[in-house]
Amino acid sequence: MNKAYYIGLMSGTSMDGVDAVLVDFAGEQPQLIATHTEAIPSHLLKGLQRLCLPGNDEINRLGRLDRSVGKLFALAVNNLLAKAQIAKEDIIAIGSHGQTVRHMPNLEVGFTLQIGDPNTIATETGIDVIADFRRKDIALGGQGAPLVPAFHQQTFAQVGKKRVILNIGGIANITYLTGNREEVLGFDTGPGNTLIDAWIQQVKNEPYDKDGAWAASGNTDQQLLAQLLSHPYFSLAYPKSTGRELFNQAWLEQQLSEFNQLDEEDIQSTLLDLTCHSIARDILKLAPAGELFVCGGGAFNTELMQRLAALLPDYHLDTTSALGVDPKWAEGIAFAWLAMRHNLGLPANLPAVTGASREAVLGGRFSAK
């Protein structure tokens, strides 16, 4: 059988590394051939975190980081190919998400901005790059996010089965597959790992709360949880999307200003409950029972999964592994899929999810030649 090799590149709002996946789309289901994670060097990570907040000299910093992130993404590709022992000539295209530094679709003239220069990636890998997937959807009046529901629909939908696919990265998003293959809903529920990561990084200088152990050692403060859940985003109707612009360290510090007496682990437990409660509320609005499959980094947080299961007793909870897709690499596979859709001239957004006026072919092509 002929191969249809594409590479997907993803770095999410967690900024915990560049995930690179090699996927074969020749069969009915995507086949994951090889994976690689390229760590983000600390100086680059600090620069990206600064760029995500308003500041001075932003254009110079943006230009430099755009190229630097492009070089890092190219390094991820070259290391992936070396690991897989596959030649660049065998790859049809790379689908690069880039690194989001602003996502503000609800302004009068909404926009989203991802960096990681695709020209640099194409030049340094010798492979054509499909990138800038979100802005076409925004140009059509959409949110530009989430984009993974179209991939979830094609890969996970089954006639007669009500399924929720929950992707927990920095931000959490859900795809509701109604059991009718044509009908799908999806949106960002709010914070996924972004606040629990930020708090443990600030207090303990650890990158993330492994297995949710620190959160499990604390007790949730119901007053703080109620205050956090009163954020207007949680009561917005979908289509909706969000990011670090709303849920960031500055917002968290503002929320904690009246709760100085709380133990640090109690704050961590409360932040984990914010993630779980906001997700569960939105899922229950869609359907009282069904199947729930989790992917993204949150799928590996034992405490998170247990709390979610307790809030959704009538859902069968599992990871996307049960459906044949490794939860760690699901989003990278989705961007390889988006590159394939572009290459075939096929639409990849879902207007019911993003609010765009129509379906569209997403992304632009950046030639290696």
Swiss-Prot record:
Pfam families per the UniProt record, alphabetical: AnmK
Group of enzyme by EC: transferase
Gene3D superfamilies found in the cross-reference section: 3.30.420.40
Any one Gene Ontology molecular-function term assigned to this protein's record: kinase activity
EC numbers on record: 2.7.1.170
Catalysed reactions, as listed in the record: 1,6-anhydro-N-acetyl-beta-muramate + ATP + H2O = N-acetyl-D-muramate 6-phosphate + ADP + H(+)
Pathway assignment: Amino-sugar metabolism; 1,6-anhydro-N-acetylmuramate degradation; Cell wall biogenesis; peptidoglycan recycling
Residues the entry annotates as binding ATP: G12, T13, S14, M15, D16, G17, V18, D19
Keywords, alphabetical: ATP-binding, Carbohydrate metabolism, Kinase, Nucleotide-binding, Transferase
Superkingdom in the source lineage: Bacteria
Keyword ATP-binding recorded: yes
GO-annotated biological processes: 1,6-anhydro-N-acetyl-beta-muramic acid catabolic process; amino sugar metabolic process; peptidoglycan turnover
Family in the record: Belongs to the anhydro-N-acetylmuramic acid kinase family.
Function per UniProt: Catalyzes the specific phosphorylation of 1,6-anhydro-N-acetylmuramic acid (anhMurNAc) with the simultaneous cleavage of the 1,6-anhydro ring, generating MurNAc-6-P. Is required for the utilization of anhMurNAc either imported from the medium or derived from its own cell wall murein, and thus plays a role in cell wall recycling.
Protein name: Anhydro-N-acetylmuramic acid kinase
Originating organism: Shewanella sp. (strain MR-7)
